[in-house]
Amino acid sequence: MRIPCLLRPLLGWFFGLCILFSALFGNYIITLFLGLPILGRHKQWRNLMDRAISYWMTIPMGLLEFLMGVRIRVSGDEIEFGSPAMIVMNHRTRLDWMYMWCALYQINPWLITSNKISLKAQLKKLPGAGFGMAAAQFVFLERNAEVDKRSFDDAIDYFKNIDKKYQILLFPEGTDKSEWTTLKSREFAKKNGLRHLDYVLYPRTTGFLHLLNKMREQEYVEYIYDITIAYPYNIVQSEIDLVLKGASPREVHFHIRKIPISQVPLNEQDASRWLTDRWTIKEQLLHDFYSEEQPINRQFPVERGDGVWRSWKEPRRHFYVKLTSLMFWTLVISFCSYHIFFVRTLQLGFLYFFVISFYLSWRYGGIDKYIIFKWQESRKSLQKSPSSSSI
């Protein structure tokens, strides 16, 4: 359904406000359960957060598809739920990770409960959503090699110890593809005697290699999923365009290749070259994709045995889950927005959330860092006790 241009900014503002208010209410609920990690109940905390926050994720997914008219097409290999893995993907826009939720939902709705994303640390400061993503234990990167390595190490140790099998999304390019980053990538290619890439940026291998080595060390990786994202009609670069202008891509396509970890070289230099080679393949794939003049005909090639998932042909139960979730959160937003002015209990509840949120940010660097801190404390106390087990 094509939406008139005059209505687009209104839809964008509505989208942004729904995300903000639903996230604030959800964050208040999250803080009510902080007693679990305090008491050392880390598995129960993680199970609760994974399910609760993935239920909230159906709001942006539903709004993108039902309100903004975004269509999702996924082709290639299926991502296995219940197997720890790394996902590497090109970073075309600042919003790729949000469309990724829609893609995972099409393959298997449970995948949105087991997907963890590495993101720029600035996104933790997003009003409402930032706190929720931190509670989901996404990995926030500071662009400081030593700090980021420690963040990866803590995350993998934590996930392994509580026996949760996640698929961790990494953007090896380190940033989205803009005019400025394309220029920097071109300078890098020229300096290192490499050919210029038109559709992707050259991947930065330091973070990839460290995460790969850590996951291998902990026996926490079975596959690497190489995902290519493309926009056949129009590209919307940032959240500013989405919220303030109401701009959204008409379709987003994903192509997945599943690679057993045994096929990835053990030597760091060879693994670095392997990743660069994957990006060269990705460049050719995107070149062929965009070489098709008619956007309606732009699709990734499907080989024998590949799956194809389309949001406009999804199973009816998947559709109704998103629809009922969207209706539920719309009622929650309406109820809270009205009663926050009159109900003292609700006012005190939100005051409690803001105080807790500020304290966790000031004292620990965020709820994600607090959870890691409490988990490490629990491990130390168990190691001192006569009998210890995983938490």
Swiss-Prot record:
Q: What class of enzyme is it?
A: transferase
According to the UniProt entry, what is the EC number of this protein?
A: 2.3.1.-
One Pfam family hit: Acyltransf_C
- Specify the superkingdom: Eukaryota
Please list every transmembrane segment annotated in the UniProt record, as residue ranges: 10-30, 52-72, 97-119, 323-343, 347-367
- Where does the record place it? Endoplasmic reticulum membrane
What job does this protein perform? Acyltransferase required for the fatty acid remodeling of phosphatidylinositol (1,2-diacyl-sn-glycero-3-phosphoinositol or PI). Mediates the conversion of lysophosphatidylinositol (2-acylglycerophosphatidylinositol or LPI) into PI (LPIAT activity). Has preference for saturated and mono-unsaturated fatty acids as acyl donors and sn-2-acyl lysoPI (2-acyl-sn-glycero-3-phospho-D-myo-inositol) as acyl acceptor. Contributes to the asymmetric cell division of epithelial cells. Asymmetric cell division is the fundamental mechanism by which multicellular organisms generate cell diversity.
- What InterPro entries is this protein classified in? Acyltransf_C, Plipid/glycerol_acylTrfase
Q: In which tissues is it expressed?
A: Expressed in seam cells, vulval epithelial cells and the major epithelial syncytium hyp7, and in several head neurons including AIY interneurons.
Pathway(s): Phospholipid metabolism; phosphatidylinositol metabolism
What are the UniProt keywords, alphabetically? Answer: Acyltransferase, Endoplasmic reticulum, Membrane, Transferase, Transmembrane, Transmembrane helix
GO cellular-component term (any):
endoplasmic reticulum
SMART domains reported for this sequence: PlsC
Q: How does it sit in the membrane?
A: Multi-pass membrane protein
Q: What is this protein called?
A: Lysophosphatidylinositol acyltransferase 10
Loss of this gene results in the following: Mutants showed defects in vulval morphology and in the asymmetric division of stem cell-like epithelial cells.
Q: Which reaction does it catalyse?
A: a 2-acyl-sn-glycero-3-phospho-D-myo-inositol + an acyl-CoA = a 1,2-diacyl-sn-glycero-3-phospho-(1D-myo-inositol) + CoA; a 2-acyl-sn-glycero-3-phospho-D-myo-inositol + octadecanoyl-CoA = 1-octadecanoyl-2-acyl-sn-glycero-3-phospho-1D-myo-inositol + CoA
Where does this chain mainly localize?
endoplasmic reticulum
Q: Which organism is it from?
A: Caenorhabditis elegans
Q: Which family does it belong to?
A: Belongs to the 1-acyl-sn-glycerol-3-phosphate acyltransferase family.
**GO MF, one annotated term:** acyltransferase activity
| GO terms for biological process, alphabetical | morphogenesis of an epithelium; phosphatidylinositol acyl-chain remodeling; phosphatidylinositol metabolic process
